[in-house]
């Protein structure tokens, strides 16, 4: 059992050192260089360097509570972020989808 702990600690340390040395972030099957952003489905990832640490930031669509007289309108899931996020349309303001010119 102690050999397993040592192996896990070694792998975690190796991963931490490798991530900083290559200056990139790993998420899912993506490799994102420091200073770059990349999208995967409706999530936007940004790999940054902060205080000599490689940091992965992710942005997703926020949950919104619906008020009376409003409805949630789904967006196209393959659209770039944040256009893939659903919108809320309210009666009296913008009940219908905005018209494109």
Swiss-Prot record:
> May I ask which residue range the UniProt record assigns to the signal sequence?
1-20
Output a single Gene Ontology CC term carried by this record. extracellular region
Query: Where expressed (tissues)?
Result: Expressed by the venom gland.
Keywords assigned by UniProt, alphabetized:
Disulfide bond, Secreted, Signal, Toxin
* Subcellular location, record wording: Secreted
- Keyword Glycoprotein belongs to the record: no
Taken from the record, one Pfam family name reads SVWC
Domain of life of the source:
Eukaryota
Assign the protein's first listed, main location to one coarse class. Answer: secreted
Give the record's PTM text: Contains 4 disulfide bonds.
Q: Which GO terms describe its molecular function?
A: toxin activity
What family does the Swiss-Prot or TrEMBL record give for this protein?
Belongs to the scorpion La1-like peptide family.
Q: What is this protein called?
A: Venom peptide Pc
């Amino acid at each position: 059992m102690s050999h397993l702990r040592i192996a896990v600690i070694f792998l975690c340390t190796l991963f931490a050192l490798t991530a900083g040395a290559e200056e990139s972030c790993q998420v899912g099957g993506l490799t994102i260089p420091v200073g770059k952003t990349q999208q995967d489905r409706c999530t936007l990832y940004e790999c940054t360097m902060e205080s000599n640490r490689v940091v992965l930031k992710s942005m997703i669509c926020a949950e919104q509570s619906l008020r009376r007289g409003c409805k949630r309108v789904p967006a196209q899931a393959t659209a770039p972020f944040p256009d893939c996020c659903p919108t809320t349309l309210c009666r009296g303001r913008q009940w219908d989808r905005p018209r494109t010119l």
